[in-house]
Amino acid sequence: MKQIFASFFAVLFGAFLAQAADDHITYEGKEGPGKGKHIVLLSGDEEYRSEEGLPMLAKILSQRHGFKCTVLFSLNDKGEIDPTNQKSLSHPQALDSADAIIMLLRFRTWPDEVYKHFDDACNRGIPVIGLRTSTHAFRGKIGGFGKRVLGEGWVSHWGGHKREACRGVIEKGAEKNPILNGVTDVFADSDVYEAYPPADAKILMR
């Protein structure tokens, strides 16, 4: 009976701790090459469920590779995760200690005080990995963040949006690139974006 009560209390206490910072999630890093480094993952898109996928990625990076990972979300006025609120990013202060940023954002219009945390992090020269809609992470002029930082903004959908799938093929000569370690040709039930990468871009997959 004591063991059952102890187990129940542990689960209840763990749930309480998770709710104590319910505007963001932090996974402490275990042992691995990323030990001592902090990755901040920014979710905020209306189509690709970054609020679900990025916590999964953060857990993998923390448990298998040792990185401390913090996931930030778009919230509504009730404090609930709401990717349609383009003006919100929870706990932006986490960016102040970021060693890298992974982002899946779309058309965000954050307040200036939130932008400042992001700008300061980028201006430190830390790596930024942009996924899918991050080419148009922020609503603004053509040639903005996507083009200047990631190498391309939004151009068009290649294939029928929400109707066709795609196949990704590893670029010839890129097979041994460490980024592709363990990766083979891929298939996705989604169309892709048309892009015109910079002349000095290294293409790993088409």
Model-assigned labels for residue ranges:
Residues K35-G36, L131-R206:
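An acidic, glycine-rich "communication" segment
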Residues H38-G44, A94-G140:
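Short alpha-beta junction capping motif
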